[in-house]
């Protein structure tokens, strides 16, 4: 016992010392401090970076011809550098920008290691269809968006990966289309084929029918003479401007219940069924610059109607609005009817049928002798709705906006359709 007593004494004093250290430590002071912004964690986290691949691989993989920003290390910018060939693409790159160059070919080795690519922009180059190696894009299983507009393509590129969601082929020379070229594009939501040489015979096999997710289809400025057949019911936006379409088959739009915007200006439309546009969800309808001679039924949800530059002599309100339902008002707010042959303004009863309307733009009308006239119209003041925001009425910058500015805005911000002319 005498031998163990000093050991117990030593342990006792050691325990007291440790207890006193923790007793005097101010825990509250440590946790009450503000976080240190300069504190660096072991892993250098950065916002807007996909960490599927270690960060150090990103910073070491950019080629000398291009620029890879540190804040977007998965993107490689090679645009506007007078490149004639596609440089080597590192494996980790997901967004590749090669627009505004002088590239003429896309070879099989162009993206051989870049299997993570999600977006490729090859617009504004000199690429021809025969210079695209077969299957070069189909080997990219993660590709979502492909830009090939403003090139020299004569044929629709084929094959393409099933993953593709957005395909832009506008401003080319496409006049050939394989029958099964679009069969595998089951995930495509947007297809732009404007400003090509497409004609009716290329579309007769209902090539768009299997695109069950397609929401936007741009076929403007082609050589179409009839409405494209077999459009998918998922379609929300359809652009057919600047073609030679003269008629619309009855019940054509019955299978397009989701259609939100329809643009058919600069065609040859003449006689159309009066209720052809009776679509449940349509908001914008543009049929200006045609040969229409009379108005048609206005669907309840339509907000913007463009009828300029036709041959309409009278806006028949009975046809436009055959009945008034106080519980379900029409949503029309803007009508453009300039450059027609109207001899008198629309009846003031239009405000009973379309209580939300704030602008009827008459502009100049064409007379029978070829001269232009201005219609004398009464001034109507629309009282603000209860749900109108007060700042819209108090803002002097918005108070004097012209009818053209107020009505020309589209619901899809594409460079083709910024203004209704």
Swiss-Prot record:
Pfam families: LRR_8. The modification Sulfotyrosine is found at residues 22, 25, 31, 39, 51, 58, 77, 416-417. Residues 53-91 form the LRRNT domain. It is found in: Secreted, Extracellular space, Extracellular matrix. Residues 1-20 form the signal peptide. It comes from Homo sapiens (Human). One of its GO terms (cellular component) is extracellular matrix. Residues 385-395 have a biased composition (Acidic residues). This is Osteomodulin. Belongs to the small leucine-rich proteoglycan (SLRP) family. SLRP class II subfamily. The lineage of its organism: Eukaryota, Metazoa, Chordata, Craniata, Vertebrata. Residues 396-421 have a biased composition (Basic and acidic residues). Glycans are attached at residues 113, 121, 187, 242, 316. Disulfide bonds join 321-353. Bone specific. Binds the alpha(V)beta(3)-integrin. LRR repeats lie at residues 92-113, 116-129, 142-164, 165-184, 187-210, 213-233, 234-255, 258-280, 281-294, 301-321, 331-353.
């Amino acid at each position: 016992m005498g031998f163990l007593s000093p050991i117990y004494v030593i342990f006792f004093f050691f325990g007291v010392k440790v207890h006193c250290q923790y007793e005097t430590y101010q825990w509250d002071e440590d946790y009450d401090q503000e976080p240190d912004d300069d504190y660096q964690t072991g892993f250098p986290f950065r916002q807007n970076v996909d960490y599927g691949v270690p960060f150090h691989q990103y910073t070491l993989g950019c080629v000398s011809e291009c620029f890879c920003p540190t804040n977007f290390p998965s993107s490689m910018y090679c645009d506007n550098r007078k490149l004639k060939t596609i440089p080597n693409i590192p494996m980790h790159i997901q967004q590749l920008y090669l627009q505004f160059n002088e590239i003429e070919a896309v070879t099989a080795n162009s993206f051989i290691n870049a299997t993570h690519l999600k977006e490729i922009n090859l617009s504004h180059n000199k690429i021809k269809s025969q210079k695209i190696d077969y299957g070069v894009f189909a080997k990219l299983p993660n590709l979502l968006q492909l830009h090939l507009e403003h090139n020299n393509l004569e044929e629709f590129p084929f094959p393409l990966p099933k993953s593709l969601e957005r395909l832009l082929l506008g401003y080319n020379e496409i006049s050939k289309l394989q029958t099964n070229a679009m069969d595998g594009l089951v995930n495509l939501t947007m297809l732009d084929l404007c400003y090509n040489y497409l004609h009716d015979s290329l579309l007769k096999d209902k090539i768009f029918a299997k695109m069950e997710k397609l929401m936007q289809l741009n076929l403007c400025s082609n050589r179409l003479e009839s409405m494209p057949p077999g459009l998918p019911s998922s379609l929300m936006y359809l652009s057919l401007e600047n073609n030679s379409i003269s008629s619309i088959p009855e019940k054509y739009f019955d299978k397009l219940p989701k259609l939100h915007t329809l643009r058919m200006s600069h065609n040859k439309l003449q006689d159309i069924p009066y209720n052809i546009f009776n679509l449940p969800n349509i908001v914008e309808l543009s049929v200006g610059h045609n040969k229409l001679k009379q108005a048609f039924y206005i669907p309840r949800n339509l907000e913007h109607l463009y009828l300029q530059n036709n041959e309409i002599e009278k806006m028949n309100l009975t046809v436009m609005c055959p009945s008034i339902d106080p519980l379900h008002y029409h949503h029309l707010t803007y009508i453009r009817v300039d450059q027609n042959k109207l001899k008198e303004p629309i009846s003031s009863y239009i405000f009973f049928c379309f209580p939300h309307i704030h602008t009827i733009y008459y502009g100049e009308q064409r007379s029978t002798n070829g001269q232009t006239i201005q219609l004398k119209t009464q001034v109507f003041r629309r009282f603000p709705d209860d749900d109108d925001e007060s700042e819209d009425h108090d803002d002097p910058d918005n108070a004097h906006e012209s009818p053209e500015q107020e009505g020309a805005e589209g619901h899809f911000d594409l460079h083709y359709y910024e203004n209704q002319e």
